[in-house]
Amino acid sequence: MVLWLKDQDKLSDMSTGTERIEMKKEGVPPAYHHSNGSVHPVILPDSPEEVPQTPGEYELTEVTSLPDCGDQENERPDMVVLDCRANAKGQREEDALLENASQSNESDDTSTDQSPVPPAPLKETSFSIGLQVLIPFLLAGFGTVAAGMVLDIVQHWTVFTEVTEVFILVPALLGLKGNLEMTLASRLSTAANIGQMDTAKDMWKMIMGNLALIQVQATVVGFLASIAAVIFGWIPEGNFRMGHAILLCASSVATAFIASLALGLIMIGVIIASRKVGINPDNVATPIAASLGDLITLSLLAGISTGLYKELEFNNYANPMVCAFFVALTPIWVLIARRIPSTREVLYSGWEPVIIAMAISSVGGLILDKTVSNPNFAGMAVFTPVINGVGGNLVAVQASRISTYLHMNALPIVEPNPAPRKCPTPWGTFFGSGVNSRSAKVLFLLVAPGHLVFLYTINSMRGGHTTLTYIFIAFYLAAALLQVIILLYLADWMVNWMWRRGMDPDNFSIPYLTALGDLLGTGFLALCFHILWLIGDRDTDVGD
């Protein structure tokens, strides 16, 4: 906190601190108090009656010039509280706005204070949140429907029937939109909202650093996902074929690399356009990331794996060369990502959530492999991307919004003496008075109508092998609602828990949440199909 006194000799009459400023003189109440370190210049009034007595936000006038000192001995010194706010790392920075518009900045070398002052948080109602989320949500949903139609078709292709481990790759690679693209969208949305992309130079630095970062992550995650698929495919029966293992590796790495590059470019365009038209990027970026993410990734996986499978008969070197080519590009992306401070930290510390999320999604892939491989449950393929995608999209929006809320309100990342905090209750998550509770209710209310629209679309396009009976729709909606309730509650707890421990939720929370969405969605859907089979709700066209 920076103080300026007209009479510096009277500084002993003042008591200063990081949390409050008050006069020691008797009868003068605190002039201004802000617990988050984000305050604006204010002159303490001469009369105590002019001081606001109730907490809240007040309209304050910035001081750009100061009056000359008088010769009167009894004149009370005027005190100017100069601008003090938290930077992107939660550390405080001080700006002294003096006469002639001179400015002095004190911050660490990671400060982003050179950009214009970030805009104030948007005041959002439930209606405005729903209006902004609805269209991207529907676009994302239709994208997952298209992905489901593709999976329903390609499940009968030779590569999927001969190398069934490819099914294990499906949730892991589709989950890349949560591990990488949605994390990228959340990270850039937060940066845009807090003013870190207001200048062209800062914007290009963020773009280049983040694109290089996701290419590194995509290559590594794609490689690890193929290893997980080989292990999960080998454990049940003990069969291992080197040719199939290299095929899985080449297909996974190539798909992850190309899909991440294409989706990353789309995300950057969406976020920049959202800011220009005055839309909160948190509401539109993550759903649009998923609207094309599943379709592009699944189409690439099917096409690349089919082409490489055909090469096994004629060329034993094609698959290893493809895998080696994309892996060899990794050092280049590492060098680019290291040059940008905002991505350097993620490059070193952001691997844990990505790798763990990939492992969680691979477990969901194992469930999908064992279920779809059974002809009695082949109808599950078309619905898996839909239920997983919708749940992941909604929880990614909520996590991104909570993270932006914490950043924009300058809440301390690490409290010096954190008080024990109980886990949030489901009632508080959905029926609290804050904007995050309102958004949770809006997102939950979109689940049932959205899934009904998507189910009708699949049925109209004659997709899948399952007749939409009333009992099937009831079980399907129950699974979808339960999945989203769990995910939204976990988002409320996880984002705040990570924030209090100094972890940036933009980088850590969304991979876990979308991976859990894949696991819960696939598990609940498989359970529904098994229950329906047991109670006799079976189709004569299953597997046709």
Curated annotation (Swiss-Prot):
Q: List the Pfam families.
A: MgtE
Its record classes its membrane topology as: Multi-pass membrane protein
What are the protein's UniProt keywords? Cell membrane, Ion transport, Magnesium, Membrane, Phosphoprotein, Repeat, Transmembrane, Transmembrane helix, Transport
Primary localization: membrane
Query: Which intervals of the chain are annotated as region Disordered?
Result: 28-55, 92-121
**Does the UniProt entry include the keyword Chaperone?**
no
Q: What happens when the gene is disrupted?
A: Morpholino knockdown of the protein results in ventral body curvature, hydrocephalus, and cystic kidneys.
Query: GO biological process annotations for this chain's record?
Result: chordate embryonic development; magnesium ion homeostasis; pronephros development
Compartment(s): Cell membrane; Basolateral cell membrane
Query: Residue span of the signal peptide, if any?
Result: none
Q: Where are its TM segments located?
A: 133-153, 156-176, 216-236, 253-273, 284-304, 317-337, 347-367, 377-397, 441-461, 471-491, 515-535
Q: Which GO terms describe its molecular function?
A: magnesium:sodium antiporter activity
Q: What is the stated purpose of this protein?
A: Na(+)/Mg(2+) ion exchanger that acts as a predominant Mg(2+) efflux system at the plasma membrane. Transporter activity is driven by the inwardly directed electrochemical gradient for Na(+) ions, thus directly depends on the extracellular Na(+) ion concentration set by Na(+)/K(+) pump.
Name the family the entry cites: Belongs to the SLC41A transporter family.
Q: What is this protein called?
A: Solute carrier family 41 member 1
Q: Which organism is it from?
A: Danio rerio
Gene coding for it: slc41a1
